[in-house]
Amino acid sequence: MPSTAVTLTQSASAQSIEAIASRSLKSIPLEKQAADQQPSVPIDPLDSPYPVPWNWVMKTYEGVSAREGSGVRYYRSHSLLSPDGEYAAYSRIQMQVQPELYRSQVSSVMFLENLRTGQLQEVKASSPLALHLMTQGKAATPGIISILAPIGWSKASDRLLARQFEGFFSTSDVSDYAVIWHRSQNRTTTLAPAQVYNNHAMSILLGWSQTNPNQVVFRVGDLGDEQWQMWTVAENGQTTLATSVEQPVVFGLRQMQLWAGEQIASR
């Protein structure tokens, strides 16, 4: 039986920056992209096919806490180019290190650049912890992890799909949300399977549904479960058990740049 989850929408704010040079593009299905990345995939708390830079997070905490006690460090992801070559999306991750891991914080900003005009805008998630960080600022609860990063485009380049990974350090309370940016309307939708909202289950974002490209696919379960089921989620929040032939896909080209990775800037 389908069930319904809460969805949240918001518009992206815009600003300007120099354009990134566009390169030739091709479409990459999720299965091939994940396979190509396997040799260098970092550890991900949810074993996602689109991992967050967890090795960097943990090494940064260990290094800064041991040498300085506390500090701020930054990480910049590679760009994800749209199939039509007109947009690039990337994230800048910030880690505020405290002597205790459970008091440290990881947050992020995801940028979307129009490569023809050079216009840059910020895409934001409306998931619970992302909203908490936006509204509370320095008064936010310690230990929050909130990382938004692009994972794929639609085949027509009219929608961008991003993974919002959030939870708390030193706990098993982590999960994924999907953030969809609509090109024609310049708005975003944040959604997750109904089980995440109603039963506090854990979910892993897998990509667009191949059988229904307007929906996204998650793997959902609880810690300790041997079998996690695949569910599709529509933009109105309707959550339905995926069919046996479901195969998640994404499109776009990941642009490998020299300036991606750990950033020198710190304070």
What is the predicted role of each segment?
Residues P2-R267:
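Sequence signature of WD/YWTD-type beta-propeller architectures
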